[in-house]
């Protein structure tokens, strides 16, 4: 399913019930991108695991609580931990965390926070004794470049230059120390 926020669909669970009847016959797996952590549930995950598991994508938005508060995204580490724990407990070994880069007031510490958040998710996976020697985890960081949009609180905030975004992308790559973490980011010049 593809949307800006899949878990906001008012009848998502009913839709998944219908797709779960159809998908196995067609050898199709279900992937739910752009999930909000505040409405991800055991019921929802059970409906996605009836067919071959693919990855789950969660919007973490920013690498630090300070920056999430600046952009008014009410995602906390506790929600990230709860959501990823639920995914791992239900057999998922791959999660993608979506972040924005170039947000207003962003510092290099916020960029390092992206890598630290991903590492904490890797550590969370291995904190379960069942996963200690089993199959590995893959945490993908996906960073989009912040582009100010009209009619939003940040519409008049200048966008970071391509050079600044490239420096932040390089710093993020240097901050990631684990082979269990993959980093994808948008081309700063086309953003």
Question: Where in the sequence are the language-model features?
Answer:
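Conserved SAM/AdoMet-binding glycine-rich loop
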Residues: 1-96, 101-140
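Auxiliary Fe-S-binding modules of radical SAM enzymes
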Residues: 88, 111-191
